Each structure stands twice: as structure tokens, then as C-alpha cells.
Amino acid sequence: MSDARWSVTDGRAISFGSTVSNDDDLRVCGDVRNKRVLELGLFGTIPNCVTMAQRGARSIAIDPSRENVQRARQAAVNSEVSVEFHEGELADLGFLMNAVIDLALCVHQVTLDTDIARLFRQVHRVLRPEAGFIFAVPHPMSAVFDGNDATARRRYGDTTPTIGELAMALQRANFSIDVMHELKPTHQPNAVAPSTLVVRARKLGS
């Protein structure tokens, strides 16, 4: 199994992992200029919140790790951009009013231990109507295999939320999925299973 959470990113594009296509290719985030964006969990050595600020967004980020926040704050200083950082659990979004965020992004933070229902409800609350919630997780099928060995080593859903569980949680939180990418590593186009699942869901209702 691969752990994409700590993959290195270079800050030049919104990243879903160092071995898969970024948003310059997928275009699920799109143009973030002048948008108020929220990164849920700091991903990479240069977090996506810094990258989005470099691209003209008004960036906000939250992460439970003080060390991650300090490191990301320094990355923002080094990049000469302003990012509003908060230390706390991803669903602890009480510092945000209702319907104030134009885009929410969560890359490789959702696990079996995540209270997905609460997180998705809180993201729905802070997003503007029809705004996008984009998240990336290790593809559930990638956890079944070890590398490119086609022998199943674990049961589907034993170590990661299944696609069905994620889809149902989004539906119950009043989101509608409009984009889903099952990404294989760019250097392994014939891999046994996709390594990364990227989903964009739109907020329904107010």
C-alpha cells in the first residue's frame, strides 16, 4: 500500500499526489483567482493552500497538527503569499460563517477514522450554493493489492472507505457528484488498480 499523504509537491500546480495528474491536467478546481478557498488538511511540502494563494485565491487552511501548520506558514512566507491558518480538526469549522467559501479542497486526509458524515456536513454549511467540494483519497482498490502484484491481499473496504460509502455520505450531506477520476500513476499506466480517487461534488441547497 502507498501512503500519498506525505508526498512531495512543488507548489506549481494544485496537487492530488506526486505520482498522478495534477489540476492543470484534470481542471476540477479550475481558476481560483479572487475565490475564497479552504484547504482541509495540509498536503505536501508546499500545501495546496499556498499554491492557490499564488494563483490569486484568498486561502484558508485548517490542520490538526501544529507542526504542519508551522511548516505551511513558513511555506507561505517563503512564497510571499498570505494564507489564513487554523489549527484544529478538519470538521471544526466554527470560525467560518455559513455559505462563505467558493471552493473546498481535501487531499489525502479522509480515512476510516474520519467522521465523514460530520466533515461533509460542515463543508456543506460553509460552501456557497453550487460551490465545489473536491477531495482526493487513496483509491479503495489500491489498498487491496501490494504494488503491481495482481493477487488480492486485503478485502475491499477493510482499510479505506469504499466508493459507495463516500458517495452515500455526500448524498446524505446534500452534495451531488459531478466529476470522478480514478487515477493511475503517470509512470504506471498499466497498474493493476488506480492509486488515487478524485471526486468533485457540488453543494445542493442553501
Regions found by a protein language model. Give the residues of each.
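Conserved alpha-helix/loop element of class I SAM-dependent methyltransferases that forms part
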Residues: 5-36, 47
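Class I SAM-dependent methyltransferase SAM/SAH-binding core
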Residues: 36-92
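A short acidic, Gly/Pro-enriched loop at the edge of an enzyme's catalytic core
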Residues: 91-104
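A short SAM/SAH-binding and catalytic strip from SAM-dependent methyltransferases
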Residues: 102-117
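A short glycine-rich, Lys/Arg-flanked "PGG" loop and its adjoining helix->strand segment in the class I
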Residues: 117-132
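Conserved class I S-adenosyl-L-methionine
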Residues: 132-158
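Short alpha-helix
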Residues: 158-180
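Core SAM-dependent methyltransferase catalytic element
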Residues: 173-176, 189-206
